[in-house]
Amino acid sequence: MEIRFTTEKPTLVNNLTIVDGLTRSGKFFLGKIISGLNNIEFFQYSFTLDYLPYMARLGAITEDGAISLLRAVVDQNCYDRSIGRNLNLRFDDRSSIYNSPVFDKYILRSKSEYDRKKIVEFLSDKDQIFLFVLHNNLANANIMFNAFPSLRIIHLLRNPVDLVYSWMKKDYGKIKLNSKIDLFGIGIDPAICGRNGPLPWYVYPIKSEYESIKNQTDRIIASIQIIIDLCRKTFKSLSIDYQKQIMFLNYEHLVENTNEAIDDISEFLGTHRSKFMNEIIVKENCPNVIEVEQRTKKRNKILSEATNKYCEILETLENKYVENSNFF
């Protein structure tokens, strides 16, 4: 007997927004900025919301099961936050509630009695925005919109030279994993099977090519290229209405023209700045100037380590980004 999970069950949360982008694009920085707008709960990170969409895409879980679980995870996480449960209190985590100017509000919730009816009303309030920061979610946005039709996504873009260099600094793309520390370094998220060990899910379209790459920097460039390609194809496959629910934002614009970027975000989300926004901007050292000379040094370092084929791929990606301010 076939069992299906319902995808019609109503959710508690009615106003969900996701900050998305490639790894090292500055999403948590953006999450802190957006959390300074009115009627927005300080952002959360959920590894389950990161994993489920691509596992459904690759057939590891049925779509109805994934949708049902995605909705349950959002509702549970937001419910827990509303009563002060499972708060991230680690000081040096970017998603720690101590990064919120009203962190005491969240701590107070954990000490207070709560009225279930009022909690449900709060979660269901269409003017109350609940914010999550995720990775590479645009690549699987179709299932996210199936789960949350009113979802809004703010996808953060960044110069690919900065991305590649940052991945190099993090030692991503290792050819051999010689220890559990190496394994942890590539992330503990569910990986697909490769000939010689686990591989990141997003390389599945180029799995054979990726495994044949013996240069770590080449692997990083190939990874970033395929993620961008997956995001682009998924975006173009969405209906016009869903495309309008996605905002593209450049990291460089956010850093250098912070107030203008905040105004654009506010309009997209239908809210406005809280009284804490100026404090947050100052704390994040914005607005600031991105030094072109530093990017030149990064580019030279990358080009000195990558092979010609992947140097050309990076050059193509960067030229498109500089000319169009996006990859789409």
Predicted regions and their residues:
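Short aromatic-enriched loop/helix-cap "lid" or pocket-rim segments at secondary-structure transitions
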Residues: 53-57, 166-169, 175-176, 261-262
